[in-house]
Amino acid sequence: MAANYWESTQRKHWLFTKDELAAMRAKLEAEEPNLVASFPLPQLRHLNIYFNQQINRLGKRMGLRQQALATAQVYIKRFYTKVEIRRTNPHHVLVTALYLACKMEECPQHIRLMANEARGFWPTDFQSQTEVARIGECEFYLISEMSSHLIVHSPYRTLTSLQGELGLAQEDVNLAWSVINDHYMTDLPLLHPPHVIALTAILLALVLRQDPSGRLPGTAASASGLVAASAALAQAQAQAQARAAMMAGGGQTVPGLTPQSSSGLQAMLPPQSPAGEGPAEGNKNPRMAKVHRFAAWLSDSNIDIEAMVDCTQELISFYECHEQYNDKNTREQINRFVKARGLDK
């Protein structure tokens, strides 16, 4: 993996705005209006959930590393910004993406083993006479559509590297890791840098762990925590902009602070004690003290708070959407166009 994200093809070629993504997808559908009309599909988030679940099933069966599963999902997202999904067999694409990701993440799998395992899940899509050739052909197709940009930087590295610096407990890291896993079912890998996603996951982990139940994101009990995190960041950003405007008007500057980093995230912190000794309830609530330390760390950095707000809101929206996911319906709609168009042959 390339050491420098800032010079990577991921940053230069595979980060988009939401409007750009929407325009690319609309263009693909406009090129195939009859196909789109004939085979309606679930919303994209539900398709991403389905792909995630299928890749995780196959990866678990084969004992693959999480990094390879994550990279495969990024490949699928990139590929489907270039190719209309109804022109492909998604099962071929996801198996091939995983096969290619294993190569890139230094845990290669033999193509015949991958084909045999895939046949166990999708016997009609992977017939013994053609399955290996099919994966080989699809591999070149993926590489071509991605312009050979195969190195993917993930948020996991940022999370593990900051564990000591931020004083994160292993439970914090585990929950943040789960949030990062979940973000691959959204468009966030195509919208924001991995370090922003990692820091958002840390924030959500710290906020959610204040719930003594320790529930993971996506449950009803955790929804309020996610909303609180989003509101805190939004309020902090507004405070930062107001403070920056006042400093600009008075000709004052504060070294190391930008409109994004000057927020201090005070909205999510407990009240300060009059003596300036830190959080008034710090000794009683160590979880809030940890949130305070993380906020102070962010205030001293140049992290884009607006991007963290967007990441948080996207995750909230995703968790709400996940509750309406219907696996049977999604699977049937995919199989319908695959069989009707003979893409399972």
Curated annotation (Swiss-Prot):
One cellular component term from this protein's GO annotations in UniProt: nucleus
Function per UniProt: Component of the srb8-11 complex. The srb8-11 complex is a regulatory module of the Mediator complex which is itself involved in regulation of basal and activated RNA polymerase II-dependent transcription. The srb8-11 complex may be involved in the transcriptional repression of a subset of genes regulated by Mediator. It may inhibit the association of the Mediator complex with RNA polymerase II to form the holoenzyme complex. The srb8-11 complex phosphorylates the C-terminal domain (CTD) of the largest subunit of RNA polymerase II.
One record GO biological process: positive regulation of transcription by RNA polymerase II
UniProt family annotation: Belongs to the cyclin family. Cyclin C subfamily.
A GO MF label: cyclin-dependent protein serine/threonine kinase regulator activity
Domain Cyclin N-terminal, residue spans: 53-144
Subunit structure: Component of the srb8-11 complex, a regulatory module of the Mediator complex.
Name of this chain's protein: RNA polymerase II holoenzyme cyclin-like subunit
Entry annotated with the keyword Repressor: yes
